[in-house]
Regions:
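Sequence signature of WD/YWTD-type beta-propeller architectures
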Residues: 1-290
Length: 290
């Protein structure tokens, strides 16, 4: 819960992107869209463009560095989007901007997480223009940024881990800013002890003041957890702005101040994707035996 893709394994995956059809009929069909050319690479950080025709994702390049790639879903080969002539820079966790540029997380600061002696690289946010290779760093945080995504009002929502002079077990805060990096402000969780972490934040399509995200701990279960709908217009602190825990209805959300917040909690979720305000695609492990 303090690391990013730069700390993840770069071998032994047999990953590919597939298109599934026949979901309603039950006659499930599978078509391979992309298979990494680099042996053992995972394929992660999937982001669909607003036109529904292009998909951006992260995979290894030929030097086994993480790079952002894009594929046209109507046909064609994948292309590497991030092309920077620096042998030790990596890019991942990207999102499209409406003007054709993109945001991504990068190890551009060349710094590490203090409490693990720098062994996990810190990711900060960059602005990148694929048309000409222009690159600009937008955040200068001691610790990690995650999950940039464009909101309906044009601002960018993301998660920032605060560390300096704070109880850092409990300080992964949802932020928002302008796409050029100005006006970086807290959106949810500043000054709160619950939850420890909020990951995979995604705005709802119509009720644009709301977003969905996964709450998790600090140590313990990594990156997965409980699925919540948030409304910062109601409150921006602790459980007071959490309006529903999914898939439950009317279940009280009780704030707990503890390190391993979601150990032994079921179901567990990662990567929610709202289709509507009421319907979500999400990866789930429903029980310890799933």
């Amino acid at each position: 819960n303090w690391s990013n893709l730069s700390s993840a394994s770069r071998k032994n995956f047999k990953a590919e992107l597939v298109e599934l059809s026949g979901l309603k009929s039950g006659n499930l069909q599978e078509k391979t869209v992309y298979k990494p050319a680099v042996d053992g690479s995972s394929v992660t950080d999937l982001v669909l463009n607003w036109d529904g025709k292009r998909l951006m994702f992260t995979a290894l390049d030929t030097t086994r560095r993480w790079q952002v790639h894009e594929i046209n879903l109507e046909g064609g080969n994948a292309r590497q989007v991030t092309n920077i002539p620096e042998p030790d820079l990596e890019f991942f966790d990207a999102t499209y901007l409406p003007d054709g540029r993109m945001l991504a997380i990068s190890n551009i600061g060349y710094q590490g997480v203090p409490c693990v002696n720098g062994s996990d690289a810190v990711g900060n946010m960059v602005l990148y223009d694929p048309s000409n290779g222009d690159l600009r760093r937008l955040t200068f945080d001691q610790d990690a940024n995650w999950h940039p995504v464009v909101m309906a009002n044009g601002k960018v929502m993301y998660v920032r881990w605060e560390y300096t002079d704070l109880t850092h077990y409990f300080s992964r805060i949802v932020m928002h800013m302008n796409p050029d990096g100005t006006e970086q402000k807290s959106l949810y969780g500043s000054g709160s002890m619950f939850p420890n972490s909020i990951f995979d934040v995604q705005p709802l399509p119509k009720r644009t003041n709301r977003f969905v995200g996964v709450i998790s701990g600090h140590h313990g279960v990594a990156r997965s957890g409980r699925l919540m709908i948030f409304d910062p217009a109601k409150s921006r602190k602790e459980e007071k702005g959490m309006i529903q825990e999914l898939p439950f209805r009317g279940r009280p959300i009780i704030p707990e101040v503890k390190d391993e917040l979601v150990n032994g909690v079921w179901p567990q979720f990662i990567k929610p994707y709202p289709l509507t305000d009421e319907t979500f695609l999400v990866t789930a492990k429903l029980s310890p035996y799933s």
